[in-house]
Amino acid sequence: MSVPGPSSPDGALTRPPYCLEAGEPTPGLSDTSPDEGLIEDLTIEDKAVEQLAEGLLSHYLPDLQRSKQALQELTQNQVVLLDTLEQEISKFKECHSMLDINALFAEAKHYHAKLVNIRKEMLMLHEKTSKLKKRALKLQQKRQKEELEREQQREKEFEREKQLTARPAKRM
């Protein structure tokens, strides 16, 4: 609730002197900055400034040093963590390369087994071809022998027929 100010001679209430209407300048204040004019009025003593600076430093310096040390420790811990992370990454890569190597060995085993089977089949085919060659040779020899025997038989029959044929007798 506001308290009415002194009344005017005609009895109307007036506003207090500290209340201003919008847009009215404040009496006694200028449009300049509050810091203007202070520098001229204030004389600075070097000793006071030095003591204030020392006090300010003594108040904030321990916290700043602790913060600096904490930051250094954090930086060192980060470096250690980065090194550890790099080592783990290299181990992970080695594991992947080991998996690749294991896969290659498994594939090599598979192809080795295939080669062994192919070798067995080739040996078996070689044995079969050798047996077939021997059999073919024997059959060829048998045919040649049979042909020779037939030829000899024909010659014998021819000789026999020749002997059986009538010959004119010789006159003596």
Swiss-Prot record:
Task: Provide the family line.
Answer: Belongs to the BLOC1S6 family.
Q: Which disease is it linked to?
A: Hermansky-Pudlak syndrome 9: A form of Hermansky-Pudlak syndrome, a genetically heterogeneous autosomal recessive disorder characterized by oculocutaneous albinism, bleeding due to platelet storage pool deficiency, and lysosomal storage defects. This syndrome results from defects of diverse cytoplasmic organelles including melanosomes, platelet dense granules and lysosomes. Ceroid storage in the lungs is associated with pulmonary fibrosis, a common cause of premature death in individuals with HPS.
Keyword field contains Membrane: yes
Choose one Gene Ontology CC annotation of this protein and give it: filamentous actin
Where is it mainly found?
cytoplasm
Tissue specificity annotation: Widely expressed.
Q: Which UniProt keywords apply?
A: Albinism, Coiled coil, Cytoplasm, Disease variant, Hermansky-Pudlak syndrome, Membrane, Phosphoprotein
Protein modification: Phosphorylated.
Function of the molecule: Component of the BLOC-1 complex, a complex that is required for normal biogenesis of lysosome-related organelles (LRO), such as platelet dense granules and melanosomes. In concert with the AP-3 complex, the BLOC-1 complex is required to target membrane protein cargos into vesicles assembled at cell bodies for delivery into neurites and nerve terminals. The BLOC-1 complex, in association with SNARE proteins, is also proposed to be involved in neurite extension. May play a role in intracellular vesicle trafficking, particularly in the vesicle-docking and fusion process.
Q: What is this protein called?
A: Biogenesis of lysosome-related organelles complex 1 subunit 6
Coiled-coil blocks: 63-167
Instruction: Give one Pfam family, short name only.
Output: Snapin_Pallidin
Q: Name one GO biological process term.
A: ATP metabolic process
Comp. bias (Basic and acidic residues) = 143-164
Q: How does it sit in the membrane?
A: Peripheral membrane protein
Spell out the subunit comment: Interacts with BLOC1S4 and DTNBP1/BLOC1S7. Homodimer. Component of the biogenesis of lysosome-related organelles complex 1 (BLOC-1) composed of BLOC1S1, BLOC1S2, BLOC1S3, BLOC1S4, BLOC1S5, BLOC1S6, DTNBP1/BLOC1S7 and SNAPIN/BLOC1S8. Octamer composed of one copy each BLOC1S1, BLOC1S2, BLOC1S3, BLOC1S4, BLOC1S5, BLOC1S6, DTNBP1/BLOC1S7 and SNAPIN/BLOC1S8. The BLOC-1 complex associates with the AP-3 protein complex and membrane protein cargos. Interacts with BLOC1S5, F-actin, SNAP25 isoform 1 and isoform 2, SNAP47 and STX12.
A Gene Ontology molecular function term of the record? molecular adaptor activity
